[in-house]
Amino acid sequence: FVFTQDFGRAEEVDRYRRLMEAVCELVVQRYDGSLKAEHGTGRNMAPFVELEWGTKAYGLMKDIKQLFDPEGLLNPGVIINDDPEAHLRNLKPMPAAGQLYAPVDRCIECGFCEPQCPSHGLTLSPRQRIVSWRELSRREAAGEAPGELGKDYLYMGLDTCAGCGLCATACPVGIDTGTLVRAVRGENISGVARQLGRMAANHFGATQALARSAIKAGHLAEAIVGPRLLGRLSGGAWKAGMPHPQPAGRATAVSGDKVVYFPTCSGRMFGADTPEAALSATVIRVLERAGYAPIVPDGVDALCCGQSFASKGLADEADQKSAELEAVLRRASDNGRYPIVLDASACSLRMKTFLAERLPVFDIVEFAHDALLPRLMLQKKAEPVLLHLNCSASRMGFAAKL
């Protein structure tokens, strides 16, 4: 079991003292048991070693310690400790995170999440984000100013978190620190930004058209001033090799097994490198070659799974777009009669989570592996391929299939 003790208050420290004394009395005096199993004696159990082993045995331990380490340099205060309240010293306050994302209160700061995090080494790891948030929560509860920590946390804790959830795959208790970050982003978002997000959600087709025009204008400017100067002028937003926008592909097959294909907005916004075909056109061609008759819902340019809004902390707008997409997919799939395929793993995971199996949604990776490969005759090519297993595909367990 996991319990989170807030050591920021004296009454909670006293409560913990009474708990430890009661547990030790129950185990040692009532059942003549051992206070430790696979774990060794640490500072938390050092005051109770004499209770467990008896005064005579504990005296022998102290004599041996004195012989080998008379200055007390080796592991001081562990096992042998004359302070009966050593387990109550230097306790770290762990205030509750509140209602933003309560599961972070279960974090024991083990650090298993750190190797999974894309931003670990750049700014903070998930463990460090949680620890920093706890300190900010403690300061707020104590009426203290957040100080430099509060300013630094905006970039190091919030802006650089990918919100991918890979930390949850390694966490012993399944904590997704990205959920906390998105909630905090939502708390901190300005009124103007929230209004713009609401407008984008309500007029997504127009927003996408505007973004397409901006990308086209960027390519025009790049042709005039060059990519390096444009990159500097845009503050690094414009990158060399920025793809051109391409429209969603059109299905042509009229016979075959029906499958609903939703071209996600990222694929609609950014086309493939010239002269390769657009992602949606490629997916449709492969589906048709495998004997499927793809159904592309009408009005896809106005549709979005909501992932882009959720990443910014706009939870209501994200759910709005997910619900709109669900309604369209339900009609297109004849109430779930036909499978539904999405071509971006982040969007697939978003809709799988939102729908909770109300509709048969498949990521293109799993559908290609499970449904397309058995129908296709493949010709292998001895050419190198760069394979990137992204965060969402990894969370859905598609490594082997990819």
Locate each region found by the language model.
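Conserved glycine-rich FAD pyrophosphate-binding loop
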Residues: 2-106, 125
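Iron-sulfur cluster-binding electron-transfer modules in prokaryotic oxidoreductases
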Residues: 69, 177-402
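Glycine- and acidic
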Residues: 2-9, 43-47, 102, 118, ...
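Immediate flanking context of iron-sulfur cluster ligation sites
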Residues: 29, 97-112, 150-164, 256, ...
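Short acidic, glycine/serine/threonine-rich loops at helix termini
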Residues: 2-5, 13, 46-50, 78-79, ...
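Generic beta-strand/beta-sheet core signal
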Residues: 2-6, 36-38, 75-77, 110, ...
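Ferredoxin-type iron-sulfur electron-transfer modules in oxidoreductases and energy-metabolism complexes
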Residues: 14, 59, 80-104, 114-115, ...
